[in-house]
Design a protein with these regions (language model features):
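NAD(P)+-binding Rossmann beta1-loop-alpha1 motif at the extreme N-terminus of oxidoreductases
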Residues: 1-52
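Phosphate-coordination loops involved in phosphoryl transfer and adenosine-cofactor binding
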Residues: 2-5, 69, 85, 113
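A structural alpha-helix within SAM-dependent methyltransferase catalytic domains
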Residues: 20-23, 107, 129, 170
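Acidic/polar active-site rim loop that often engages polyanionic ligands
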Residues: 24-27, 83, 146-156
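Conserved N-terminal Rossmann-fold NAD(P) cofactor-binding segment
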Residues: 30-85
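Rossmann-like NAD(P)(H) cofactor-binding subdomain of soluble oxidoreductases
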Residues: 87, 92-152
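Internal alpha-helical scaffold of NAD(P)-dependent oxidoreductase catalytic cores
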Residues: 134, 152-184
């Protein structure tokens, strides 16, 4: 499966970094946020990250027009965020009931082929796979903070994750400049 359009759910520290890193590497990115207030809080985070990228990454210094091309759309609309996405990376609060409510809210909107990933660092994907309605296309993709320099991404499936979904996520992680740590 080819991943072109990604949606990052959550605009906190890691959600913002995942969105910008993905846009930096040329993916079309939508950030879904719960409220207009969340959108307003995410904008300065993204701008600060763009500044960091411009100051620290060689590729940005040599050809800044080729990177961070404004490919990030911020929205609170579920249909806009999830109706045409290939990959969802959920980076919301580490509260199991909130994750359940989130996955339940998008389940019927997602295209059939969409793969779902959690960025959770404290909850195993097997604890959440039942929330998704697509256990074969659900796994963890966990990033380290400051992903532009700590470029590792842990990829962890569940007993029900398909090999195709797992490999597509490993390929995506590599495509955005991560060293994919495959946890099986």
């Amino acid at each position: 499966m080819e991943i072109k359009n990604i949606t990052v759910a959550g605009g906190g520290v890691l959600g913002s970094q995942i969105a910008l890193q993905s846009a930096y590497k040329g993916f079309s990115v939508t950030m879904w946020l719960r409220s207009e207030g969340s959108i307003e809080r995410a904008k300065p985070k993204l701008e600060r990250l763009r500044t960091i990228y411009k100051q620290t990454l060689e590729a940005m210094k040599t050809d800044p027009a080729a990177y961070c091309r404004g490919l990030i759309t911020l929205t609170t609309d579920l249909q806009e965020a999830f109706g045409d996405t290939d990959l969802v990376i959920e980076a919301i609060a580490e509260i199991i009931d909130e994750k359940d409510a989130f996955y339940s809210s998008i389940r019927d909107i997602l295209p059939q082929q969409t793969i779902l990933c959690t960025n959770s660092s404290t909850l195993l994907p097997s604890a959440m796979m039942g929330f998704t309605g697509r256990e074969d296309r659900f796994l963890a993709l966990h990033f380290a903070n400051n992903i532009w320099k700590n470029n590792t991404a842990e990829v962890m499936g569940t007993p029900k994750t398909s090999e195709e979904s797992y490999e597509a996520v490993v390929e995506f992680a590599r495509a955005i400049g991560m060293i994919a740590l495959e946890l099986k």
